[in-house]
Amino acid sequence: MEILASRTLFRPVDYQRSLSFYRDQIGLAIFRDYGAGTVFYAGQSLIELAGHGAPEHPAGPFPGALWLQVRDVRATQAELESRGVSIAREARREPWGLHEMHVTDPDGVTLIFVQIPDDHPLRRDTRGERRNPEGEPEANI
């Protein structure tokens, strides 16, 4: 199997309210508006708000979160606050080393804005690195 592309798909309770939130408050650029829904650019991914159909599962909070990497989480927080976005959890450094700030969309979906510090392991290039059976890098001999 070859995955060619992916996107996160939401079926909001109130399409117009969610459209305004993602477009006007969060500031995502529109990739495509197809009448019954809108697709936004989100870095190298896409987020789609479907204004049609109904989910096959009971209504309830989305069990996950939308993880959005930004260059500067504090500047992002200030920008969102200036647009009237309520910050659910202020920017801070997490025990795992990432800088995170949380916002909640109109349907209760958590958006986690993440800044990866320059010295964080996520920035290390591990291509070609040999690993032992436990998944840890092998020492160079």
Segments predicted by a language model, with ranges:
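Amphipathic alpha-helical segments
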Residues: 16-29
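Short beta->alpha transition motifs characteristic of CBS
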Residues: 50-51, 95, 102, 113-120
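Conserved short beta-strand elements that form part of the metal-binding/catalytic scaffold
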Residues: 29-61, 110-115
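N-terminal beta-strand motif that seeds the catalytic metal site of vicinal oxygen chelate
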Residues: 1-16, 46, 64-66, 117-141
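Vicinal oxygen chelate
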Residues: 5-13, 38-41, 56-83, 99-109
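Short acidic/glycine-enriched loop/turn segments that link adjacent beta-strands
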Residues: 34-36, 94-99
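A common structural junction motif
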Residues: 26, 83-88
